[in-house]
Amino acid sequence: MLLLADSGATKTDWYIGNNPTDGLQFQTEEINPFHQSPSIICTILEKQLLPHLPVSPASCHRIFFYGAGCKGEGCKRLERVIADFIPMAEINIYSDMLGAARSVLGNNEGIVSILGTGSNSCRYDGNEICDNVSPLGYILGDE
């Protein structure tokens, strides 16, 4: 099964399923490895994610997590925490911006924006983000 997450500053939207038409969708609070410690993330996964899973966590073979704060060392920390819960899965952690680009543009080139608690934009080449101006951050009111 596939486990997919889109996490922003206020919530995480989750999807679990074998294909786009047969899955289950639910929400937990936000998960941000830049602002949250591994123990806080662990508590969110244990108390909010696991109860929603309709199958054993071991049935999740591929995980794609797109989230705010997911870059550099934050990705590695989050991957280690998720691997503690679902150790046999292929775990992929990417930025929320790449998630937005992939969901809107697929394999096509273009510009995509996120307008939410935090705001951002980028140019996408159909595979990866190729140009991005660093936002001010939601604390400074980049919306």
Predicted features and spans:
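A glycine- and small-aliphatic-rich helix-loop capping segment at beta-alpha/alpha-beta transitions
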Residues: 19-22, 80-85, 110, 126-131
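Short beta-strand scaffold segments in enzyme catalytic cores
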Residues: 12-17, 102, 113, 119-125
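Short glycine-rich, Thr/Ser-proximal phosphate-binding strand/loop in the N-terminal lobe
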Residues: 2-43, 129-130, 135-137
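Short glycine-aspartate micro-motif
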Residues: 2-6, 60-64, 110-114
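Glycine/GP-enriched mid-protein hinge/lid loop-to-helix segment characteristic of carbohydrate kinases
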Residues: 109, 121-143
